[in-house]
Amino acid sequence: MERKYRNSFALEVKALMADGRFAGYASVFDNTDSQQDVMRRGAFAKSLTARRYPVQLLWQHQWQNPIGVIDAIFEDQHGLYVEGKLLLDVAQAREAHALLKAKALRGLSIGYSVKRARRNPDSGARELLEVELWEVSLVTQPANAAAQVTVVKAETDYCDVLMAALRGAERVLLR
């Protein structure tokens, strides 16, 4: 089994609330990163259903530095969607929250091990078909240039975010 401790994918933080709650994508499918890896739909499915422990929310992939909790995590058509909460009693989580609000911190990254992959003969990229997810981290320097926070909304905008997510889910279900 090949171990891979970190990899960054496009992140879209859809909301950041005053109490530290956030929602967004920790991994986006079909996006080639700087390490020539492409996460494919379904890659997280087995790992998420077989979990015996929660996915950790870490600072910069540092196992000794948890900064919050993941409340919900699942695959949709776009990628790996997460909802979490920074624990603002933790100093590093408060700093991360301030950096996110100021848009100084822009990346999310995942720690995982590769269970099944194949090489794309045309592009040379490694397509990740099955991974075991260990953790989600807030990071300052993601491996993928597209791995950045695109939207940070205030608490009053959270209802708009939820409505947009519901509309997106409705489109997927009606297909």
Predicted segments, located by residue:
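Terminal, non-catalytic protein-protein interaction segments that mediate quaternary/complex assembly
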Residues: 1-3
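Residue microenvironments linked to proteolytic maturation
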Residues: 5-16, 21, 72-168, 173-175
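Generic detection of intrinsically disordered/low-complexity segments and helix-coil linkers/edges
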Residues: 16-19, 23, 38, 53, ...
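N-terminal "first-domain core" detector
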Residues: 19-44
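Residues at the C-termini of beta-strands that transition into short coil/loop
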Residues: 28, 61, 137-140
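Short, charged/polar surface micro-motifs in flexible loops or helix N-caps
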Residues: 31-32, 62-65, 88-90, 116
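Short, solvent-exposed polar/charged micro-motifs at secondary-structure junctions
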Residues: 35-36, 66-68, 119-121
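A glycine-rich, hydrophobic loop/mini-helix early in the fold
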Residues: 43-86
